[in-house]
From Swiss-Prot:
Its EC number is 7.1.1.2. Pfam families: NADHdh. Core subunit of the mitochondrial membrane respiratory chain NADH dehydrogenase (Complex I) that is believed to belong to the minimal assembly required for catalysis. Complex I functions in the transfer of electrons from NADH to the respiratory chain. The immediate electron acceptor for the enzyme is believed to be ubiquinone. Belongs to the complex I subunit 1 family. Keywords: Electron transport, Membrane, Mitochondrion, Mitochondrion inner membrane, NAD, Respiratory chain, Translocase, Transmembrane, Transmembrane helix, Transport, Ubiquinone. GO terms for cellular component: mitochondrial inner membrane. This is NADH-ubiquinone oxidoreductase chain 1. One of its GO terms (molecular function) is NADH dehydrogenase (ubiquinone) activity. It comes from Carassius auratus. InterPro entries: NADH_UbQ_OxRdtase_su1/FPO, NADH_UbQ_OxRdtase_su1_CS. It is a multi-pass membrane protein.
């Protein structure tokens, strides 16, 4: 009985609650970083240095009346944000930090498959809103997400060839001698740009182009349901950065200090997340055709070439004696 309780309730909660807390403070860091980069303070009234701002925001969002457009589809309108957050939380299950909640043999494929399912929540929310702006935003988001998943999948394939396994724990063993970032830096650069596009962040935030589409697919959402979308988006940002840290900046395990493993990994993920915010503060939005051109004309041929190269190299050099 206790074992079942641990597996189905306490373990997932021990993951979900810290992720939600991290998301809350990521929003605060984002506002602070953007503030200081625009030569202003950012939130600094609620609590010391604005530290309680995310709590105030959360309370404000959840006590607002959830307004629903009269012409919208009632079930789908509420199901979409719930699905978005559920997927965002489930994605954390196979992450090795240092031990995953569910030790999956195909952890990477699980993450790729579930992140593809997020498309349905976006499309559902845009369609259920029964608003032309929401629908245009949703269609843009879906096209962008699907396009960049192609390059993400191919980059993952190359990286899997490096590590020789689909489990995320193998990456720590692979990178004990050297970070994969160093031999595979073009892949790492393309991976990072693709994660920016995959999570709909600036400079690829065409789905939320305030100047054109009001707010994108979540334009009709307010209060609680909007907060769920918001949490899902930021949880995905943290997940993608943690994944980038595992894949390219791995080997967080220091043999004589195993306690530092999680701190090590999370520090890398936090630095990558701050880089996300820095990119947002620095770059203007892409034009839609440039966004698509980048992935289909630049990333796709390059990643395909890398997959071929990394597959062919060990086979071509297999006949050489190891002394060389």
């Amino acid at each position: 009985m206790l074992n079942t309780l641990m597996t189905h309730l306490i373990n997932p909660l021990a993951y979900i609650v810290p992720v939600l807390l991290a998301v809350a403070f990521l929003t605060l860091i984002e506002r602070k970083v953007l503030g200081y980069m625009q030569l202003r303070k950012g939130p600094n009234v609620v609590g010391p240095y604005g530290l309680l701002q995310p709590i105030a925001d959360g309370v404000k969002l959840f006590i607002k009346e959830p307004v629903r457009p009269s012409t919208s589809s009632p079930f789908l309108f509420l199901a979409a944000p719930v699905l978005a957050l559920t997927l965002a939380m489930t994605l954390w299950a196979p992450m090795p930090m240092p031990h995953p909640v569910t030790d999956l043999n195909l952890g990477i494929l699980f993450i790729l498959a579930l992140s593809s399912l997020a498309v349905y929540s976006i499309l559902g929310s845009g369609w259920a809103s029964n608003s032309k702006y929401a629908l245009i935003g949703a269609l843009r988001a879906v096209a962008q997400t699907i396009s960049y998943e192609v390059s993400l999948g191919l980059i993952l394939l190359s990286v899997i060839i490096f590590s020789g396994g689909y489990t995320l724990q193998t990456f720590n063993t692979t990178q004990e001698s050297i970070w994969l970032l160093i031999p595979a830096w073009p892949l790492a650069a393309m991976w990072y740009i693709s994660t920016l596009a995959e999570t709909n962040r600036a400079p690829f935030d065409l789905t939320e182009g305030e100047s054109e589409l009001v707010s994108g697919f979540n334009v009709e959402y307010a209060g609680g349901p909007f907060a769920l979308f918001f949490l899902a988006e930021y949880a995905n940002i943290l997940l993608m950065n943690t994944l980038s840290a595992v894949l390219f900046l791995g080997a967080s395990h220091i043999p004589n200090m195993p306690e530092l493993t999680t701190i090590n990994l999370m520090t890398k993920a936090a630095l990558l997340s701050i880089l996300f915010l820095w990119v947002r503060a620095s770059y203007p939005r892409f034009r839609y055709d440039q966004l698509m051109h980048l992935v289909w004309k630049n990333f796709l041929p390059l990643t395909l070439a890398f997959v071929l190269w990394h597959t062919a190299l060990p086979i071509a050099l297999a006949g050489l004696p190891p002394q060389l």
